[in-house]
C-alpha cells in the first residue's frame, strides 16, 4: 500500500527545487535560477518549517507539552496557519490573535485546525505599527491573560525560526544541488 505517515509533521521539508529556464532566457542570464517549491509543505508554505521547529525545539527543552500548554501567537499570515496545523497534529491548544481584515477562507481554515481565534484591541495592534517589534510584548501579554500555561511562539524573535533553515532548508538545497548552489 505504499508509505503511510503517522502525522503531517513527518511531511515538512524535502520540497522540490525547479529551475526557471524561461525566466533565465527572458532575462538573458548566464547563470541558473531555481526555486524551492515550499507550497508542497503540509500547511502550504515555508512557514511550516519554522513553526514545527519552534514547537519541537521547545518540546526538547521541556518548555511545553500537549497535556498542559497552550501555544500563543499574534499573526494573520502563513505562520498562523502552520502553527495551527502542527498544534492540532501534536495535540496542543493554540490561541491566535488576528488583525482585522483576515479573509473568511483563512478564518475557516484556522477554525478547522481548532485554533482559538482571539480578537485583539485595535489600540494594541496600532502600537505594533508605531513602536515596532517591542510592542508585540503588549499584544502577547493581552492574549495570554486567562490562559493556563501559555507559551508564546514569538516567531519574530525566536531563534528557532532561523534555526529551522540552518538545520533543514539550507542542507536540503545543498543536497538537492549536489553542493553546487551559489548565491
Q: What positions do the PLM features span?
A:
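PLP-dependent amino-acid enzyme catalytic core
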Residues: 1-183
Amino acid at each position: 500500500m505504499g508509505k503511510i505517515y503517522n502525522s503531517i509533521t513527518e511531511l515538512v521539508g524535502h520540497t522540490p527545487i525547479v529551475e526557471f529556464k524561461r525566466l533565465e532566457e527572458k532575462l538573458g542570464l548566464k547563470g541558473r535560477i531555481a526555486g524551492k517549491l515550499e507550497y508542497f509543505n503540509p500547511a502550504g508554505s515555508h512557514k511550516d518549517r519554522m513553526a514545527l521547529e519552534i514547537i519541537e525545539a521547545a518540546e526538547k527543552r521541556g518548555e511545553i507539552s500537549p497535556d498542559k500548554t497552550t501555544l500563543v501567537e499574534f499573526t494573520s499570515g502563513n505562520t498562523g496557519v502552520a502553527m495551527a496545523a502542527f498544534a492540532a497534529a501534536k495535540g496542543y491548544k493554540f490561541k491566535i490573535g488576528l488583525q482585522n481584515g483576515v479573509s473568511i477562507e483563512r478564518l475557516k481554515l484556522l477554525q478547522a485546525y481548532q485554533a482559538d481565534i482571539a480578537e485583539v484591541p485595535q489600540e494594541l495592534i496600532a502600537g505594533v505599527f508605531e513602536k515596532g517589534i517591542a510592542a508585540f510584548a503588549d499584544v502577547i501579554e493581552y492574549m495570554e491573560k486567562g490562559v493556563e500555561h501559555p507559551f508564546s511562539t514569538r516567531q519574530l524573535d525566536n531563534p528557532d525560526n532561523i534555526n529551522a533553515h540552518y538545520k533543514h532548508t539550507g542542507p536540503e538545497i545543498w543536497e538537492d544541488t549536489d553542493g553546487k548552489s551559489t548565491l
